[in-house]
Amino acid sequence: MRECLVFAAGLLAFNAVAGPVNLNQVFKLRVGAETVRFNPVEDGDLRRLDRQVQVLLSKPEGESKHTRRGLEEIERLTENALNRPTPADRKQLEIDLVETVLAVNNNARPPIPRHFDAIMTPLALLQLFRPIGIGQKPAANLQPGPTDDLSRRDPLPSSFWSLPPDIATENLHDGFGRPGLPRIADKLCRYAAPKETTGMNPGFEVDCGQERVKLKFGEVSSEPLVTRMFWALGFHADPTDYAAGVKVAYDRRIFTEFNSRQPVRTTFTVLWFIPVYSMNLQRSKDPFAYVAAAVLRDGRHWSGPELKRRLMTGTNFLPAVEAQIDYVVTTPANVQVKDPLVKSIGPWDYGQLDHANRREVRGAGLLAAWLGFYDTRFDNTKLRVVGPKKHPRLEHYFSDLGGGLGRTKGLLSWHGENVNAFPWTFTAPPLDLGKGRLARPLRIVGYTPDVRTPAFAAMTIDDARWMARLIGQLRSDQIIQALTASGYDPATIHLYTQKLISRRNKMIADLGLAGEFPPLTLE
């Protein structure tokens, strides 16, 4: 089922185009049935945009909280741009405004086409071509510096990435600059809200003391590992941890709201309007399958299947049985403690605006390839407002990094969290056509993202070497720290460590950096 999803999602990514930001053009803000056209460099257009956004915000809340938050940010940015800032500040406000508008638009963008017609078959076949590292043009956002080796130049400061102060000294067990792991296992949490996104993996939110925590029953170990690596190398990623089980006070809504995820539907047609077949790719899950134990008030324990058998009569709950249950313990989950100062607006896309011309977004392709992270659909990213309301800033997050550490190449055969399927290498030496000329200096051969990813395709040898120098600073014990915190057993930790080191060493050699970074060994 997931293969159908990513194949269809690729059709939406097909038309993404890379290029520099041209702000002197008409953009469209789409909210429900409303479309607002504006040119961000024209004050008259900004005033009109501001008025229309105020009208949208004055209506009863019919839009999602993310869209409404985006409209509030558009209002703030527009008014600041009209308040006579310096030319440099005005340009940044215009860029932030357009980024926010596109993120709001992306909220209404379906993860797959709402219908697939036979006439789209050639386009679908083109989706099978998902290149990485075939770029020729240098990144457009490099800091000033020598031109003899562009791979040594960092990108200009941005909302996507910041230079890590000292990669080799980071504690990747706790990760994310924290003094320790969250102590969720020690708390009795209370059910708070269902998961209502389009994600395939079930989950829900709980309140654990003063913290709101997201539980996700899928990619329980790969996501904590991959997020730690992205964060360590300077990207914005949600602090994600492995939990062997979470104690949640009994609440009927755990079961009645478990399948609240949004449907993901597509209709197959011929001649564009004759329906042939409809499919909902969002499958319902049995909530009792994610209960490891139910703990009764008298101290007895029931398994998930036993709880279901005793608690339910058909689709009806038995109140007398409910009264006996103190709390449930979930199966392993990946958990994210929500930061009240980090709020989502909507997804950003690897191919929108100048994203594919940015060194840091291109370089993320090599990091993704090393870790086998393949799920690069646009809805696995988020543009977020960070900080207090009086001084907010925008940051681009890699928000769902779970698809990795498994089978990393194929037409429709990716599979994460599979140590035996995870290859030992993913690069090859430069291809020499003779006479001292290198036809293909960058060859990534063991990795393919699941959708066309323009920024990864645009990656050049210089972008790859830039990222490889960051990866090369990681120590083997840091890899072990991250794997241990991610809940893997000792044998799996050992094999993953060997493979990640092997992939790292081969990558360093194939990119011509062996003189800078000696081979890493398993300490």
PLM feature spans:
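Bacterial N-terminal signal peptides
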Residues: 4-15
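Regulatory N- and C-terminal appendages and interdomain linkers associated
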Residues: 17-191, 208-210, 473-523
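C-terminal catalytic region of ATP-dependent kinase domains
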Residues: 27, 99-114, 388-523
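Second-shell loop/turn segments in exported
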Residues: 38, 211-219, 252-255, 349-356, ...
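Extracytoplasmic/periplasmic, Sec-exported soluble proteins
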Residues: 41, 66, 198, 218-222, ...
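Conserved ATP-binding subdomain of kinase catalytic cores across diverse folds
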Residues: 175-335
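Conserved kinase catalytic-core segment
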Residues: 220-223, 228, 337-419
